[in-house]
Amino acid sequence: MKVLLIKDVKNLGKAGEVKEVKDGYGKNFLIARGFAKLATPDVIEAWKKEQAKKAQEEAAEIEKLKQLKEKIESTKLVIKHKAGANGALFGAITNKEVAEELKKQGIEIDKKHIDIHPPIKQAGEYEIDVKLGHGIHAKLNLVVEAE
């Protein structure tokens, strides 16, 4: 029996491959557990269309993230924070504060995607890494001013 693998199956193959398997293994294990479908021409064609659609959506998502990266990298963010006489901040700048300031400028970024390392505890200029997904990273220019 020929089956189209929907998910990766150890010792058999990767998703999207058509494999010849024994009838019992195909019906009772692979198809029953949702790892595969019976490989008919209609099923194979539907799978190919679905994969093409997913690839197109992913390409659109990557393009959108690249545009967001350009917008972030062209932005200079200024945050005012209470500080002592020598420029040492009372507390550190958090990723939540950075996310809120970006939101005020019309850029929606989840605070989990903002990587501030080491913590910012001094007034000055910093470059912060923003992880956008799909391996795309943006560098945000941050200026911390003492209040």
Curated annotation (Swiss-Prot):
Role according to the record: Binds to the 23S rRNA.
Pfam families in alphabetical order: Ribosomal_L9_C, Ribosomal_L9_N
One CC-aspect GO term: ribonucleoprotein complex
MF terms (GO), sorted A to Z: rRNA binding; structural constituent of ribosome
Protein name: Large ribosomal subunit protein bL9
HAMAP family: Ribosomal_bL9
Alphabetical UniProt keywords: Ribonucleoprotein, Ribosomal protein, RNA-binding, rRNA-binding
NCBIfam families: L9
Protein source organism: Nitratiruptor sp. (strain SB155-2)
One GO term of the biological process aspect: translation
Family membership: Belongs to the bacterial ribosomal protein bL9 family.
